[in-house]
């Protein structure tokens, strides 16, 4: 099972997504793919911040389609994820490093559900010891 990061969903929502993303998504069994509530918040914020117009309307419609498609596969930042976030964030802090947010929250959700993560930005996820798939390079 795979948690899709915000950058992957954002790319898939474009009018012309990268061919590698389209191919990778087409090859996955839909029931194995999940979103996080954090990704939904990031997408809603990004769309909400746009000026009124066709682009905003198209992205709003695309997000509505994503929400419908993933209705039963959206994972929340719950108490289990909060515990994992705290565990994961303490280690880098002790080493004098930061732990990113919101990627840290997405990492914690994936870790609490034992999911791999599909993302272009792999650093936070690999640092947490998660299995990471980069669909932009998966075919390479």
Segments (PLM) and residue ranges:
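Short, well-structured N-terminal submotif of metal-dependent ribonuclease cores
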Residues: 1-35, 39, 48-65, 139-140
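A generic structural signal for residues located within well-ordered alpha-helices
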Residues: 4, 17, 97, 101-102, ...
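Residues that scaffold the ATP/ADP-binding catalytic core of kinase and kinase-like folds
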Residues: 11-12, 24, 46, 85-88, ...
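Active-site neighborhoods of divalent-metal-dependent phosphate/nucleic-acid chemistry enzymes
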Residues: 45-54, 72-120
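Acidic, PIN/NYN-like endoribonuclease modules and their adjacent C-terminal/linker elements
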Residues: 107-140
């Amino acid at each position: 099972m795979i948690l899709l990061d915000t950058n992957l969903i954002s790319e898939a929502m474009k009018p012309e997504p990268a061919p590698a993303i389209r191919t990778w998504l087409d090859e996955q069994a839909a029931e194995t793919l999940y979103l996080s509530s954090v990704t939904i918040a990031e997408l809603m914020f990004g769309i909400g911040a746009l000026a009124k117009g066709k682009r905003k309307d198209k992205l709003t419609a695309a997000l509505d389609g994503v929400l419908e498609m993933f209705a039963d596969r959206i994972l929340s930042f719950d108490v289990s994820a909060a515990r994992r976030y705290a565990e994961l964030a303490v280690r880098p802090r002790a080493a004098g490093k930061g732990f990113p947010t919101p990627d840290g929250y997405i990492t914690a959700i994936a870790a609490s559900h034992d999911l791999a993560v599909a993302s272009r930005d792999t650093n936070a996820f690999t640092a947490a010891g998660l299995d990471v798939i980069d669909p932009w390079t998966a075919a390479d």
